[in-house]
Amino acid sequence: MPSIPHHPVTTSTAHHADRRGSWALVVGASIACLAVGFAPMPLWDEDEPRFAAIARTMLATGDWVVPSYNGTLAVDKPVLMHWCMATAFALFGPDERAARLPAAVATLLAALALWRAGSRWFSPATGVTAALAFVGCLLVGIEAHAATPDAILTAATAWATVLAAEPLIAATSATARLSMRRALAVGGLCGLAVLCKGPIGLVGPAAVLGLWAWGCAAGTRVAASGQRGPREVIGGLWDATVALRPLAIGVGMLAVAAPWYAAVSIRTGGEWPAGFFLVHNIGRFAAPMENHRGGLLFHVVGMLVGFFPWSCFLPLSVVLAGRRVAHGGGGLPQRRALALGLVWLTVWLVGFSLSATKLPNYVLPAYPAAALLVAALAVDACRQTTWPHPRWLTAGVVSLALGGVATAATVLVASRHGLSDAEAAAAVGIIPVVGALACWWLRNRSPNGALAALVVTGLVYTGLAVGPAARRIATSNALPELVEAAHRHAGGTARLAAFPQNTPTIVYYARGQVREYAREQVRDWPAEAAAAAADFLRSGPDAVLIVPADHLTALEPFLPPRTAVVGRRRPLFKDQDFCLVGTFPDAGAAVGKAPARLHR
């Protein structure tokens, strides 16, 4: 990796050349890291296949207003992510990599926002380091290769925050404010975020910018008057409101987001907004959904894992940034930029810590702030004649090595509990150990080299962890292969039904609607549902049922003649197989190995 430039430039030509070089470094290194992670692998978990299925339905039906999943209204997320995926499907075909491409592009855009902020507010070295620290941490790498909305939300909110803060960073008077054009642009970005994940796309950036601008404006009034009192605080609130132009931001947001929200509300008779706002916003905040719960420190602990390897130095960075903001270290623009990073990080962490439903990806919009803080303090430390806070440095390097050991141990333990044949993926844990040794060896010989070693460690570790290592782990994702076996049995595309449990993975890989014979759909369980499932099998040789093994006995009395278990696989972390039940035309027919006959 090229050395990170550290010295300020003195001419306009040199300045532009330095910016172009640092921009090219960020783009090239980010694309390389993201590309390594694009190993072909099936869609994971519940969200990826569900969202991809919604996008594919949009493309197939031409209805880009009302999201639908398996023939039902999908109310869990707004439409921007689905639009992005459907566009990628139209350009590159409906496969897993196309579904994940929008998240990767959004991650690159968020990295460029950090490059811009770090370069303008601190130095080109800080911009490069912040961008690559963001790309080269674990959770960002995972979300950059996931068919989910979080990376898109993070890019939109990061750009909105950076563009809104820029005019106020170096302002020395209370009259500084966003231009009308900039305020509308910030509002448009918030509108995209609202189209991506709902009200949080506006509430999050507004809370960050409002609190930060209020503090800056109050500080300006205190500096001018020499007094600290209610007048300065209240006056600062007014100055911040004027500076941010909230009405213009609101107009920009509504111009982007309101047309679709109005259209989907009209098309669904109010059903979509009722389900989304009442259930998936208020409901998720008030009570845990889908057993996603955690304590108040859930997101703090989760960030120490998700921001690895840079989390090894995040606590020190937060403490040092707080000291500089409180005690006046450095210039005013740098102090304000550090204050923005602290507020940015705190608002997202605290806000989602108060929510009853918790998932690590909820606070992904805080990760740009963490990257900016760590980069600013790391670059500054490299410029000192000796390392400040050597004990913290030692603790960080040791944590880096231990993180590698923990990575390997986690994979090895998981391989004994469902991740079959994944042991080789544990080798990715060697990278942080090697990186820690390199940082320690270079700490006094070349501080810039030590920082570059940490940057490379993050990029290589993250790229391999979400690429080749994840590809190895993906062999345990059994349901996609089971659905493909159903298609092979049908001699083309199977018509699938699930008894009694359906999953988004089955729906996506079914390439069509999957019928469901579930407990909640009938009065007489299991007889009524089993009889209906058996009737489905009689409808043709391309009809295949997916049944958990412990439900075969309930189904068996109702099955038609010449029925067999034509395939079975055990999904990840399940305690039983999922079976394919199909029909065959004569006694000698079979698919692959001889089927286990249920009825002759």
Predicted regions mapped to residue ranges:
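Membrane-integral, polyisoprenol-dependent glycosyltransferases
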Residues: P2-W387, K574-D577
